[in-house]
């Protein structure tokens, strides 16, 4: 997935780095089975509320998306509107955004046809499900739902930020009401088929609202270095760092990704994805994702040789 294509108030689309997107598409010459998807929007990306407002604006946007797909020979698009009905990121919002988002996706499916990839990136908390997206109505229209099951502490400061940002389950070190499993259950209960849910994992660490470090940075300068001690929360199924006795960083590693991949398989989810590949230049976590899905028995043994006994998912 290429992130991000920009959208303006008229529903026009701009590709900030067209040569990079074209280079991604060229990879299909070597791997024809590869799908290349363009993500539209992102945090603080304005324009969606206007694009979704009227039948004319919706179909104008859909035709612009069709042109983008044709011009770059893409397999589809991912809609990353953060979030319908909310101006928390500084974007324009309207009370009818929730219903209009469904109509926007309907127009896209009408223009793009039944086989083009259309996914939606979103969360699974009750506010999102109740106020931002009609999950049961968009479910038949989309190919997949990219569950952003991370950044749980992105709005937290102080001691509230000293919690896991992407825990699989609840624990004493997680924010009440926030877990990947809870998000998945909320989505399924709201009408999203499990096989359409793609589970997201972060390739970075977070402490509260403002401090983030790529996995490359964590591996080279933080994990068991400079006073930072590695620990693993067997309840939450994720690692974290402690410094001077205090929670210092939440992150995912090979073990937690393996456990999340097993969760995907055990719960018949559609797959797993990451945000974002540039934070893992050594492809350590990317390999963990691949091996955990495609070679779980062999990879589990490899992890045990490195980390010791692996907790049950």
Walk through the language-model features, giving the residues of each.
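Glycan-recognition patch characteristic of GH18 chitinases/ENGases
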Residues: 1-69, 162-163, 174, 178, ...
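Conserved beta-strand positions
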Residues: 1-2, 74, 79-81, 120, ...
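Substrate-binding surface in catalytic domains of secreted glycosidases
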Residues: 9-19, 84-225
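Short, well-ordered coil/turn segments that N-cap beta-strands
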Residues: 32-36, 73-77, 114-116, 141-143, ...
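Conserved, mostly hydrophobic/aromatic
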Residues: 38, 79, 108, 145, ...
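Glycan-binding loop/region signatures in secreted carbohydrate-active enzymes
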Residues: 40, 153-170, 174, 195-263, ...
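Short, acidic/polar
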Residues: 53-71, 126-137, 180, 184, ...
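Active-site groove signature of glycoside hydrolases
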Residues: 64-95, 151, 273
């Amino acid at each position: 997935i290429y992130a991000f294509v920009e959208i303006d108030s008229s529903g026009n689309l701009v590709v900030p780095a067209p040569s990079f997107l074209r280079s991604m598409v060229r990879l299909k010459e070597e791997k024809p089975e590869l799908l290349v998807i363009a993500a539209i929007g992102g945090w603080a990306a304005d324009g969606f509320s206007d694009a979704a407002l009227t039948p004319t604006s919706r179909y104008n946007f859909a035709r612009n998306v069709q042109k983008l797909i044709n011009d770059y020979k893409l397999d589809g698009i991912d809609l990353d509107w953060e979030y319908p009905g909310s101006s928390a990121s500084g974007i324009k919002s309207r009370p009818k955004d929730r219903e209009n988002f469904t109509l926007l996706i309907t127009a896209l499916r009408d223009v793009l046809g039944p086989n083009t990839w259309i996914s939606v990136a979103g969360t699974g908390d009750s506010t999102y499900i109740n106020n931002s997206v009609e999950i049961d109505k968009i479910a038949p229209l989309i190919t997949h739902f990219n569950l952003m099951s991370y950044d749980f502490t992105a709005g937290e400061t102080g001691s509230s930020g000293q919690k896991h940002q992407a825990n699989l389950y609840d624990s004493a070190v997680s924010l009440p009401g926030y877990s990947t499993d809870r998000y998945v259950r909320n989505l399924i209960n709201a009408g999203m088929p499990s096989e359409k849910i793609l589970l997201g994992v972060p390739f970075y660490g977070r402490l509260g609202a403002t401090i983030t470090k790529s996995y490359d940075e964590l591996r080279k300068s933080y994990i068991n270095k400079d006073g930072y001690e590695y620990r693993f929360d067997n309840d939450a199924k994720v690692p974290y760092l402690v410094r001077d006795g205090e929670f210092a960083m939440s992150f995912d590693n090979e073990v937690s990704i393996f456990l999340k991949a097993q969760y995907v398989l055990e719960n018949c989810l559609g797959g797993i994805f990451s945000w974002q590949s540039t934070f893992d230049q050594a492809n350590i976590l990317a390999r963990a994702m691949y091996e955990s899905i495609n070679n779980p028995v062999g990879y589990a043994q490899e992890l045990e040789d490195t980390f010791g006994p692996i907790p049950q998912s």
